Amino acid sequence: MASESDRTVPDTRSASRPLADRVEELLATGGPLPIVAAGDPVLRRGAEPYDGQLGPGLLARFVEALRLTMHAAPGVGLAAPQVGVGLRIAVIEDPAPVPEEVGAVRGRVPQPFRVLVNPSYEAVGSDRAAFFEGCLSVPGWQAVVARPARVRLTALDEHGRAVDEEFTGWPARIVQHETDHLDGMLYLDRAELRSLSSNEAMALRWSQPTPERAAAALGFALPD
């Protein structure tokens, strides 16, 4: 049985308080922000479009806190709802520390730090790719998700500049995963649930570059 943390996490989500005040209180805790886990309603609500609610200075501090939290977790992406803030803001960064064979099969290449404000994506073409993925809000588990192999992402950056880019391979998976968070979706909503595996099982059995062996053993289909 897991013991409850004795760290007090401030309630930053009271609807009666201005968002800026709630974020200020959250940032006052210092260090990496607490990551909320599946079962928290904030992860199931569509996030509010960002329209200057935090102001430039507070936005910059919040973005830096997201970056710090993502690195500490560690992860390759983090959406604002995952720290209890229902705004359409996410950060991504992937140094791609994987063997060359794995990187080639999964299309995993290094991605610089990026801030995505009000992002949305659409599939480009019909190709789909299926790989195991995990989530900082669902710790300890991974599952296979089939996603569009190429997507067009539109968003703003932290300075309000337009972003309109196509992503392929693992970067496409990251931007889809984080944008889904902003729409109240978890990766498990799109996953092949027969593939659900603990991190221990992943390390022991399913560390291959593709999930083909897992599909055969666990009884689930992969896209053609």
From Swiss-Prot:
Binds 1 Fe(2+) ion. The keyword Zinc does not apply. It comes from the Bacteria. GO terms for biological process: co-translational protein modification; translation. GO terms for molecular function: metal ion binding; peptide deformylase activity. Its cofactor is Fe(2+). CDD domains: Pep_deformylase. InterPro entries: Peptide_deformylase, Peptide_deformylase_sf. Gene3D superfamilies: Peptide deformylase. The active site is at E178. It catalyses: N-terminal N-formyl-L-methionyl-[peptide] + H2O = N-terminal L-methionyl-[peptide] + formate. Keywords: Hydrolase, Iron, Metal-binding, Protein biosynthesis. Removes the formyl group from the N-terminal Met of newly synthesized proteins. Requires at least a dipeptide for an efficient rate of reaction. N-terminal L-methionine is a prerequisite for activity but the enzyme has broad specificity at other positions. Belongs to the polypeptide deformylase family. This is Peptide deformylase 3. It comes from Streptomyces avermitilis (strain ATCC 31267 / DSM 46492 / JCM 5070 / NBRC 14893 / NCIMB 12804 / NRRL 8165 / MA-4680). The gene is def3.
